[in-house]
């Protein structure tokens, strides 16, 4: 898919779809996408083959001019994801579940297959 003329939202959406497809191929089950709560958000909530819930932040770039995508997951962003994860767990009454925070970095460049880097346990719960 050509990226020229695509806005940041469209590129981000494509990155999230690419990440979700990747997770499914790895044996994950997607439970929810783009979960929002008061002060929190999670791009993808998925369950791995061992039954662990992965709260996944997806960062997408068209080039490395501004650095690696995963470096954009700041302390503030980790806090927002943590709040979203806690809200999702509460909403779904899964207080005893095993969970972790992953980051998937997606590099989308015209004429190339997407480059995907999955970082399980990328960070701990941030209060």
UniProtKB/Swiss-Prot annotation:
The lineage of its organism: Bacteria, Pseudomonadati, Thermodesulfobacteriota, Desulfuromonadia, Geobacterales. This is UPF0102 protein Glov_2230. NCBIfam families: PRK12497.1-3, PRK12497.3-3, YraN family protein. Gene3D superfamilies: 3.40.1350.10. GO terms for molecular function: nucleic acid binding. CDD domains: PoNe_Nuclease. It comes from Trichlorobacter lovleyi (strain ATCC BAA-1151 / DSM 17278 / SZ). Belongs to the UPF0102 family.
């Amino acid at each position: 898919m050509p990226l020229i003329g695509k806005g940041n939202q469209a590129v981000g959406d494509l990155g999230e779809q690419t990440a979700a497809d990747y997770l499914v191929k790895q044996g994950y089950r997607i439970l929810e996408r783009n979960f929002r709560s008061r002060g929190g958000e999670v791009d993808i909530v998925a369950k791995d083959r061992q039954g662990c819930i992965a709260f996944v932040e997806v960062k997408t770039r068209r080039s490395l001019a501004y650095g690696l995508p995963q470096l954009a997951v700041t302390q503030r962003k980790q806090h927002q994801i943590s709040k979203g994860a806690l809200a999702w767990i509460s909403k779904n009454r899964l207080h005893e579940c095993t969970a972790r925070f992953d980051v998937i970095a997606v590099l989308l460049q015209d004429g190339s297959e997407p480059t995907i880097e999955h970082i399980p346990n990328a960070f701990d719960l941030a209060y």
